């Protein structure tokens, strides 16, 4: 069966409470695509992968999930992945308000 993409991971956005995600929380829709941006010069984690909605930085891919993804981006394979909103829970603690899914896309 053909699938245009396959989910390989899901997680809450790390550091959501420290960035500007709250500014766009009410606008987020399940299924909406978000943008992954590597931060290879990040002083805390050279594998850091920031998550953006438009120009709004929402937080990061958790450190436990970012190393292989950052490596793929470093070697030019960024087109093979997409990040989508899976759950928006405004009433939860900030670190559990937005859960996203990481998908590998079919390039065949």
Predicted feature locations:
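Conserved active-site motif detector
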Residues: 1-108
């Amino acid at each position: 069966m053909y699938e245009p993409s396959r989910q390989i991971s899901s997680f809450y956005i790390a550091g959501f409470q420290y960035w500007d995600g709250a500014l766009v929380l009410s606008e987020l829709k399940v299924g909406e695509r978000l943008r992954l941006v590597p931060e290879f010069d990040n002083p805390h984690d050279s594998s850091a992968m920031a998550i953006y909605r438009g120009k709004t930085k929402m937080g990061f891919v958790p450190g436990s999930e970012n190393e292989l993804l950052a490596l793929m981006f470093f070697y030019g394979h960024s087109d093979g992945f997409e990040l989508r909103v899976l759950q928006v829970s405004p009433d939860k603690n900030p670190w559990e308000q937005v859960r996203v899914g990481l998908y590998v896309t079919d390039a065949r």
